[in-house]
Amino acid sequence: MDNFSYLVYIPSLNTKKRFIQLNNNKHISIVKFIQNKDVYLAEYLVSMIEDMCIDNINVKNLTGLDLLCILLAIRNICIGTRLELTTDVNNEKSSLTLDLGDILKRVTDIKTKSTTIKIDNIHVTIEIPRTLVIESYIDFISKIKINKSVYDMRSLSKSDKHKITDLLPGKVVTSMYSKIGDLSSPITIVKGISTLPEMVIDATTSSIFEFIKLIFDSNLSNFYTYYYLLASKMHLDLSYIDNITPIETEIYINKYKEEMEIAQKSIESESKSPAVGNIPAPSPGAQSSESIIPGGFKF
């Protein structure tokens, strides 16, 4: 094993799988998908999870909660455990810092269950969807039994699923809707206040996918500024920058800032010293162009 890897607990499998790190290249791709509102973001994330897992894993068998746990762990290890939320409503600003490590523990502890609806000669088993984006009640169905015919809905194409569910009478579908809300216990991430709306993670809604977008979104302009500084000022190869993690990138940037601050203080100190010989003293406040450092950037 050449690269650093780490274990991630997957609730539905009740086991841990080993993953490699998220690099800048992948993170930028995620951010672009998010900001372009691209419908293929969910597909990209699932494919990325499969690529990053060293152990054998069938991502098609993972629930939305499993995928959230994996992505939260990746985010915590490779980007950081803190997420700062800010809003500005009616000129009233609010900010809140979330501990994603704590949220991962709470999500891991969410209890899920399956239930079977039995009406006449029809048995329908519903479970937490194995997808990030929930399109309809069909995503909750894992198995349908009509008389002696049994259909494994997880193995069917979307069109075949619709053909089977079209056979279900209205009273079965109505019963399913009433049972779906009982499959999971939602957790509150943010309690609603005047300028920050309530945020809840519920495995029976699309809140999981929306939360994933929130924790991975970032400022693309900052990324390119970081790339410029690391390549032009610290002389790092672009392929190397592509393949380090966002948190490693921030360490490099902070180190560069520290060096420039030391250089700036040295220049200011020299500017206050008396001139020696024929060497003119720098004018007060003089600084090199390299001492001007973009600040305030955060992932």
Language-model-detected regions and their locations in the chain:
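An amphipathic, hydrophobic-aromatic interaction surface with interspersed Lys/Arg
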Residues: M1-S273, K298-F299
